[in-house]
Structure formats: C-alpha cells, structure tokens
Amino acid sequence: MGDAIGGDSGVVKLKPSRDARARAGHPWVYEGEISSVRGNPPDGSIVAVCSGSGSFIGRGYLNRASQIAVRLLTWKDEPVDNEWFARRLQDAFRYRDLVAPEARSCRLVHSEGDGLPGLIVDRYEGCLVFQFLTLGMDIRKDVLVRTSLELAGLKAAYERSDVRSRQYEGLEQQRGFLGAPFDASSIQIRENGFA
C-alpha cells in the first residue's frame, strides 16, 4: 500500500540541549527544539527525528507552519506508511471493543492517547465522525477514513474539523459528508439502554 505521501522525506535533527523530551517519549517537537531539517521535506510528510548527537529518536510528521513542528508517531525504527496507520487504527478500535464491547456510540480514536496525534474518531451508532486537527492527519484523510470505515464495518462518515486549532496548522475549517451524503436524522444514539 505504501505511504500516500512518501517514506521519510527528510531528517529533523534536534538541538543537543533540547532533545530529552522527545527521547523520553513526548510526542511533540517544538520549532525551537530543532537544530536543522535535511532533505527539504514538504509539510505533512513523514520525517525521521534524530537527537543532537545524531542518534535515531523516532518518526513523525512535519509542519513548519505550526509551533509544534513535528508530531512523533513512533519511537521505533519502522516505516510509517498506510499499513502502519491501519495497524494503529486497528489497535485503537480493538481496545474500545475490549473495554466497552456493547458501546455503539463512543470515541474510537483519541489523538495522542492512541498514538495518532491530530486525529479524533467518534462512533455514533452507524456513523463515524472525524476531526482532522493537524496537517499530517488532514493530508491522509482518505486512507484514514477508508480504513476506519472498513474496521468498523460502516459506510457513513462525517467530518467535523470546524475547530479553531486548525488555523495554527495553516488549515481551513472543514465540515461535511465524507463520501455519499446520508440522513443523519435517522441515527439514534443509545447508551445504557436509553435512546
């Protein structure tokens, strides 16, 4: 399947005095922590992140327009491609099914909490509602929606990326159907036996 954007398109090297947070597993790399960017990667692309001494820390997606310049996705030396995103989504969906097997309306993906910074996916009975809060997730929208719908066994998807935080990523607010329109008034939410 491969990455819709490409593999590592660059290397972000951190300042020696500013790499401890990323090495400790924090998913955000601020612009002030970066020493250099090699390879001229486009914003939104997957980059390798290295310590000040040059050792591998992880991989994430870059956005120079944001104060959070890199959002780390993994601290393993593994490719971050469409299959990687599919596995991470599958892990999140399985976890929800494990802790709340009867839930038909719940948060399936909660951004950094599920290792997918900038992505929120909620299920409302037969519909998935997406928020793409960062450029790195927004440009992968098609594969994230398609994979999520396949995993959930659903067809209906709606986007609610109408939040102000997108402006910090250089993105416009978005709201609307993802795919064929559907009658949202037919969706009835049930929780603990109540509708």
Show the residue positions of the predicted features:
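Non-catalytic accessory regions of SAM-dependent methyltransferases
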Residues: 1-125, 149, 175-186
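Surface loops and adjacent helix of pleckstrin homology
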Residues: 61, 133, 162
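Carbohydrate-binding surface patches
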Residues: 128-132
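Helix N-cap motif at beta-to-alpha junctions
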Residues: 135-138
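Non-catalytic substrate-recognition/targeting regions of SAM-dependent transferases
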Residues: 111-116, 120-122, 140-195
